[in-house]
From Swiss-Prot:
The gene is gltX. Its main location: cytoplasm. It catalyses: tRNA(Glu) + L-glutamate + ATP = L-glutamyl-tRNA(Glu) + AMP + diphosphate. ATP binds at residue 255. Monomer. This is Glutamate--tRNA ligase. Belongs to the class-I aminoacyl-tRNA synthetase family. Glutamate--tRNA ligase type 1 subfamily. The keyword Repeat does not apply. It holds the Pfam family tRNA-synt_1c. A motif ('HIGH' region) lies at residues 10-20. CDD domains: GluRS_core.
Length: 484
């Protein structure tokens, strides 16, 4: 059986987007499911769009997700180089070989001429397409241009009568007629290979067997099949084109939408766990055989098959990601949780500063993402407390509670140790003694200590407030009988 080799081939043009991350995850899972190899190749031939630090950012964010390549620029194998800018001579040599065989040709058309033709096509409501001006130039004309050092690109001669078809692993049979394609540029005027030309050569040289990528590459696949054919390559990867990721309005997720966090770096900064992000992204366009939502990376590897990948649009639901992340946060041990959350914790209440771990643990079961803890702390400990700050509706809850509050105050005063267990036990005793079940006791107490109806563990809140403040607040409510 052939060894499965997949690849993720980002361009260093910025941060790792969820679309690229999902592509990397799917290719990683496919390779590992079959005990194959996953390669990361850097496609940096579009020099105008490359940004400084782009390569490091892409690879670091993939490492954070746990998507570790078997081969890359940092751990090369036998199929390098793993960055296209180090392979320019190979692309150039092969492009000129195609010219020599009559399968490609030099195009001397200027940018201005090509832009004029493009605008004319658009004005006539036609798809812009190269008109083939230089396709059949006489050899003397070509030589004259070369002697005069006229800049040129190299274009592939597309067979307009051919059909380019493949059995897409996600979408089934796809056929694109040759007459819908243009004579694609293989080599730019600066001698640098274009994306479509370089990717075909790299996939061949690296023995890539399977390529899963975004739906926007469907049209590129037809060109790549034509290039494979021209180069005489017999081994062509199996292609699969993934679903489009859409926002809540059904539109394709746009990197320009700054209101939606959609870059892996942002998830790190907001306090999402890498396991949760991988779990969430794996479910964008893939359905498991199991009726479940939570998968470890090893469970994903075991379960992932291409026949469960769907082509229908995948909804990017940030609420679902938060729900998944909350699950993973709850699963952490207390020590692991504190080590995680301490990176996001900014406590500015003096009486809480020496209780970072206790405060953090109080909100463990409420958190959707790390940075949210500061808002939860603020909502719980910052509200103005006391009878005068209660709404009229809430004051109604305290009718006939004075005796219970007085007894609670006395029992709390008598506690030898101010611990959560002791406070919780006292609350239970008061509830039983006065037949105050559930909300009849706990909601009024929450209002006393947080001015909120809901929140984290009540005993934990009381312990963090401290015995003195708890007793003082209870006495204020006990003596405010005229307000209830």
């Amino acid at each position: 059986m052939e060894k499965i080799r997949t690849r993720y081939a980002p361009s260093p043009t910025g941060y790792l987007h969820v679309g690229g991350a999902r592509t990397a995850i799917f290719n990683f899972l496919l390779a590992k499911h079959f005990n194959g190899e996953f390669i990361i190749r850097i496609e940096d031939t579009d020099t105008e769009r490359n940004v400084e630090g782009g390569i490091e950012s892409q690879l670091e964010n993939l490492r954070w997700l746990g998507i570790i390549p078997d081969e890359s620029i940092y751990n090369p194998g036998n199929y390098g180089p793993y960055i296209q800018s180090q392979k320019l001579a190979t692309y150039k040599k092969l492009a000129y070989e195609l010219v020599g065989k009559g399968l490609a040709y030099r195009c001397f058309c200027t940018k201005e001429k090509l832009e004029h033709e493009r605008q004319l096509a658009l004005e006539h409501h036609q798809t812009p397409k190269y008109l083939g001006t230089c396709r059949n130039l006489h050899s003397k004309h070509i030589q004259t241009n070369l002697d005069n050092q006229v800049p040129f690109t190299i274009r592939l001669k597309i067979n307009q009568d051919a059909e380019f078809a493949w059995n897409d692993q996600v979408r089934g049979k796809i056929t694109i007629p040759g007459n819908s394609l243009t004579d694609i540029v293989l080599l730019k005027a600066n001698g640098i290979a274009t994306y479509n030309f370089a990717v075909v050569i790299d996939d061949h040289d690296m023995e890539i067997t399977d390529v899963l990528r975004g739906a926007e590459h469907i049209s590129n696949t037809a060109y790549q099949l034509a290039i494979n054919q021209a180069l005489g390559y017999q081994r062509i990867p199996r292609f699969g084109h993934l679903s489009v990721i859409v926002d809540k309005s059904g539109k394709k997720l746009s990197k320009r939408d700054t209101k939606t966090i959609q870059f892996i770096e942002q998830f790190k900064q907001e306090g999402y766990l890498p396991e949760a992000v991988v779990n969430f992204l794996a479910l964008l366009g893939w359905n498991s055989d199991f009726n479940r939502e939570f998968f470890t990376i090893n469970q994903l590897i075991e379960s992932f098959t291409v026949n469960r990948v769907v082509g229908a649009p995948a909804f990017f639901d940030i609420k679902k990601l938060q729900w998944i992340n909350a699950h993973y946060i709850k699963e952490l041990s207390d020590n692991a949780y504190f080590n995680f959350i301490d990176n996001y914790l900014t406590i500015d209440f003096d009486y809480l500063k020496n209780k970072r771990k206790e405060v953090s643990l109080l909100f463990k079961n409420q958190l959707a993402f790390g940075i949210e803890i500061n808002q939860l702390i603020k909502e719980t400990f910052a509200p103005k407390l006391g009878v005068q700050h209660l709404s009229v509706k809430h004051r109604e809850l305290f009718k006939e509670l004075q005796s219970a509050l007085q007894q609670l105050s006395e029992q709390l005063q008598a506690l030898p140790d101010w611990t959560k267990d002791n406070v919780k036990s006292t609350l239970t005793q008061i509830g039983e003694q006065f037949n105050l079940k559930g909300k009849k006791l706990f909601m009024p107490l929450r209002l006393i200590f947080t001015n909120k109806e809901h929140g984290p563990d009540l005993a934990g809140i009381m312990v963090l407030h401290g015995k003195t403040q708890v007793l003082a607040l209870l006495q204020e409510f006990i003596h405010a009988t005229n307000l209830f």
